């Protein structure tokens, strides 16, 4: 990777793109330290610390700590991520949007424009909920209409600026800008997580105990990274053969190809969906100061990921079971709406393609579905293992880390994709980076 970057710096165009990307990253990190006017940051920091691991910790990891700092970038890129997921689902549910998506570059530009508007609306709603919900409890130095409006405008504008920076990185930098911003936010929390693990397992312990703890932590991290790489790059290739056709005096066609089915087709979406649904009631109750009691209080505690692996309260582990089931369900659900075996089989039939040993048309569709279901299950199980490890660490050892399975999947996939993009641009210019190794 380092050799690739060094070779990329030898090319003026790529060097400028990389430097532009770094400059935009610096702007985002600086903006993450600028406080929102009229906000009591100490109150929010102490409140957040009392929450422990959970929905807000997950949210803070995606904002790079901007949320706990209550900076102008507190909402960061999260409204855009939510907006993108909503639009992706809507293109399946609404035929007009689906046609727009298939309408080439012009259609994609229209969808991107709609996504921006939805992002601003979501940011506005989230900012208003924060200002009004927490404002009464002490978030605002003075709880009045003016301060509420200032906070709402500042947070909404901050989210819009981060979205704009992400798009500029995509246009003038390297990689997907939104993904780069998200990865930088997650990585910015890494030193804090390492310090927390050091305090929990190594500091004050005997040298031998500290060394063993460090080795175990390192081994777990390496195992997680290996599993994530397998999930990210694992592919089942279905061979496809194309029949030969006679055109004039020549035979054309007859080539071999394949249909790549990724092990983890849905990416981190199942984890995000499952976590969001389970933690949403907790977030709403926190915003409006609702303290659940009795039966409903127990339900809320069961939804909180910080209680799932609590040995002193094993009844809350039912929340972990529900989480695992939801991750597997959403892995199947999301893949079913983004991957259409029937459409693929019909296109193959029109082009004279077939899977060896399988009849074209409906039998091909059934075969793809059968293979896909097995692959999704394997990917969903791997995704679940990566996703629940942080909860186990938190419950059994009290180690609260934001650098969990979801973060790791995002980081690995974005880094690998960015490297591939740099490599492809270098190959165009007869550079081969580490591909020569």
Region locations from a protein language model:
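N-terminal cationic and glycine-rich segments that engage phosphates or anionic surfaces
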Residues: 1-101, 105-437
């Amino acid at each position: 990777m380092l050799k690739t970057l060094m070779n990329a710096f030898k090319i003026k165009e790529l060097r400028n793109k990389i430097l532009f990307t770094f400059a935009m990253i610096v702007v985002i990190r600086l903006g993450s330290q600028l406080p929102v006017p009229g906000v009591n940051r100490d109150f929010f920091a102490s409140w957040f610390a009392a929450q422990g691991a959970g929905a807000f910790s997950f949210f803070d990891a995606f904002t790079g700590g901007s949320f706990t700092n209550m900076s102008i970038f507190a909402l960061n890129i999260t409204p855009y991520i939510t907006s993108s997921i909503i639009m992706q689902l809507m293109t399946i549910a609404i035929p007009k949007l689906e046609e727009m998506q298939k309408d080439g570059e012009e259609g994609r530009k229209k969808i991107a424009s709609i996504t921006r508007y939805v992002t601003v609306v979501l940011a506005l709603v989230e900012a208003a909920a924060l200002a009004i919900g927490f404002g009464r409890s002490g978030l605002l130095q003075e709880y009045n209409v003016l301060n509420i409006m200032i906070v709402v405008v500042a947070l909404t504008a901050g989210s819009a600026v981060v979205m704009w920076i992400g798009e500029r990185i995509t246009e003038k930098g390297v990689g997907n800008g939104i993904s780069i911003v998200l990865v930088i936010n997650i990585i910015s929390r890494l030193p804090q997580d390492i310090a927390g693990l050091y305090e929990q397992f190594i500091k004050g312990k005997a040298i031998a105990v500290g060394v063993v703890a460090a080795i175990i932590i390192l081994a777990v991290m390496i195992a997680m990274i290996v599993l994530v790489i397998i999930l990210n790059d694992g592919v089942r290739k279905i061979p496809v053969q194309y029949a030969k056709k006679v055109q004039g005096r020549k035979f054309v066609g007859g080539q071999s190809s394949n249909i790549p089915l990724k092990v983890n087709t849905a990416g981190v979406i199942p984890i995000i969906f499952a976590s969001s649904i389970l933690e949403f009631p907790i977030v709403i109750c926190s915003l409006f100061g609702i303290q659940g009691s009795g039966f409903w209080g127990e339900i809320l505690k069961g939804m909180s990921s910080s209680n799932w692996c609590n040995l002193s309260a094993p009844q809350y582990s039912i929340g972990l079971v529900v989480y695992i089931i939801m991750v597997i369900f959403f892995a199947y659900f999301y893949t079913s709406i983004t991957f259409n075996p029937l459409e693929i089989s019909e296109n193959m039939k029109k082009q004279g393609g077939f899977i060896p040993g399988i009849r074209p048309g409906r039998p091909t569709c059934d075969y793809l579905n059968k293979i896909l279901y097995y692959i999704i299950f394997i990917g969903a199980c791997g995704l679940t293992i990566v996703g629940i490890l942080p909860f186990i660490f938190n419950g059994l050892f009290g180690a609260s880390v934001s650098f969990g399975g979801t973060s790791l999947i995002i980081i690995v996939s974005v880094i690998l994709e960015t490297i591939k993009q740099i490599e492809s641009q270098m190959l165009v210019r007869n550079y081969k980076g580490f591909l020569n190794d």
